[in-house]
Amino acid sequence: MNRQNNHGVLWGTIKFFMECLGSHKSYVVDYERTDDILFHLTVAKPQGLLGLESQSETVDVALAGGYVTSEAEVLSFHADFPTAKIIVLGGNWWKYTSEAEMAANKLGMRLMKLNEFLSALYSRKLV
C-alpha cells in the first residue's frame, strides 16, 4: 500500500473513499480501483415506476487529495485519467476554485466534494 501517489492522495483518503463505496452497496453494484486513485464504478440506475428494472451503468471517478483543487490539477487529472467523468475531493471541508470548476465543465467532467458525491449517489443522479 502506498503512502502517497503522483496526485498527493494519501492512503487514508483512498481507504476512507473505498469504505464509503462499500457502505453504499444498494447504489454501488461494484467497483474496481486502478492507477491507485481511479475508480471504475458500476452504479444502480433509478428503477422504473414498478421497480422491476435492475439495470446499472458505469462511471469512472478520480479521487483528489488536496485541501484546494485548482484548474491546473483538473487539467492534470484529465491528462492522467481521460475516462474520468467525476473528480471527487476526498474531504467534505475541501474546496475547489471557480476556475477549476469551469475547466472541469469544459472538459465534460464534474467536481464534487465527498458529501456531494454521496448525495448524488444516493439520489441516483451520479451519471
Residue ranges of each PLM-predicted region?
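Acidic-basic catalytic patches of nuclease active cores, encompassing PD-(D/E)XK
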Residues: 1-47
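Hydrophobic, Leu/Ile/Phe/Ala-enriched alpha-helical segments that form helix-helix packing faces
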Residues: 17-21, 77-78, 104
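Conserved catalytic cores of phosphodiester-cleaving nucleases, focusing on short active-site segments
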Residues: 39-78, 84
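Short, well-ordered alpha-helical microsegments
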Residues: 70-72, 96-101
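Short, low-complexity, polar/charged sequence segments that are solvent-exposed and flexible
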Residues: 79-83, 105-108
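Acidic beta-strand-to-loop metal/phosphate-binding motif
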Residues: 84-92
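Charged, structured surface patches that assemble and position nucleic-acid processing machinery
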Residues: 101, 105-127
